[in-house]
Design a protein with these regions (language model features):
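A contiguous loop/helix-start segment that scaffolds small-molecule binding in enzyme catalytic cores
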Residues: 2-5, 11-14, 88-92, 148, ...
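Conserved active-site and cofactor/substrate-binding residues in soluble primary-metabolism enzymes
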Residues: 26, 30, 36, 46, ...
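Class I S-adenosyl-L-methionine
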Residues: 1-24, 29-126, 226
Length: 265
């Protein structure tokens, strides 16, 4: 029991919240309620400013994202920030792009909170592969084309050895592949998928800044997508989708079509 009741303040709760892929309307009602109520919001660079604008006046907003090419915040510091804010009795929202448990290091942050005995909740978000697929008109499964979906990262923890990730095996899966953080290594990834047996004419798409005003999509084949998308100026943040379902984008690409027909504002 604290010896001085005047100093006592209950520890706050940390909410690990998915902000979705970009379009603020893809935020869940629960995420919106928590963002509005938070005393402190600790956010990444992929969180849209329109979502941060929902924070209440006076809420503390703390950026912990990594700027491209620069190193901002070691994971241990981010975890330390969450613990400190909670111990100050604050309601903390840790806002992450997409879903906190899909390549978002939400697991590590939840582990740190659990180890420190801080109360936490996880609020799922629309992960960017789902946002990219829907807005590009690529059904990730389809009774005629694909019965399985895999989420993969093209950029592993540098501490892991190369052999721990066998792209050749994924080339044999006959599944839709959704590759996060794949742009830098796309040439080698697509080469290794083909070495595993994936036909070079399998359709592939790169979707950059999916669901946002800057959304761009590029469709090619596994054989040519790396070079062709680079030549077309595509880069991170982008999702690469590989599989026969990508063919449907030529019929179902509603988002680009609607934008093309929209009157200039
Ligand atoms: N937790 C996030 C993923 C974070 S890793 C999620 O669930 O989506 C960061 C990677 O996510 C980026 O390199 C990119 O591959 C992908 N990404 C995030 N937002 C994106 C967007 N709007 N469009 C395309 N890819 C996106």
């Amino acid at each position: 029991m604290p010896h001085n009741f005047g100093d006592f303040r209950a520890t706050g709760t940390v909410y690990l919240v998915g902000a979705g892929p970009g379009d603020p309307e893809l935020l869940t009602l629960k995420a919106l309620r928590l963002v509005r109520a938070a005393d402190a919001i600790v956010y990444d660079q992929l969180v849209s400013p329109q979502i941060l604008a929902f924070a209440r006046t006076g809420a503390q907003t703390i950026f912990v994202g990594k700027k491209p090419g620069a190193f901002c915040c070691p994971q241990r510091d981010i975890e330390g920030t969450l613990l400190r804010l909670a111990r100050e009795g604050k309601t903390v929202v840790r806002l992450k792009g997409g879903d906190p448990f899909v390549f978002g290091r939400g697991g590590e942050e939840a582990e740190a909170l659990a180890a420190a005995g801080i109360a936490f909740e996880i609020v799922p978000g629309v992960t960017s592969a789902l946002g990219a697929a829907s807005y590009t008109g690529i059904p990730l499964t389809h009774r005629e084309h694909s019965s399985a979906v895999v989420f993969l990262t093209g950029h592993e923890d540098p501490k892991k050895t190369d052999s721990s990730f066998r792209w050749e095996d994924y080339g044999r899966l006959d599944a839709t592949l959704c590759i996060y953080m794949g742009m830098k290594n796309l040439e080698s990834i697509t080469r290794r998928l083909q070495a595993g047996g994936l036909a070079s004419d399998t359709p592939a798409a790169v979707i950059q800044s999916a669901t946002t005003g800057a959304h761009r999509q590029f469709v090619g084949t596994v054989g040519d997508i790396a070079l062709a998308s680079e030549r077309a100026g595509f880069g991170a943040p982008a999702i690469v989708i590989v599989g026969n379902v990508v063919r449907l984008a030529s019929k179902l690409a509603w988002f680009e079509a609607n934008r093309a027909h929209a009157l200039p504002s």
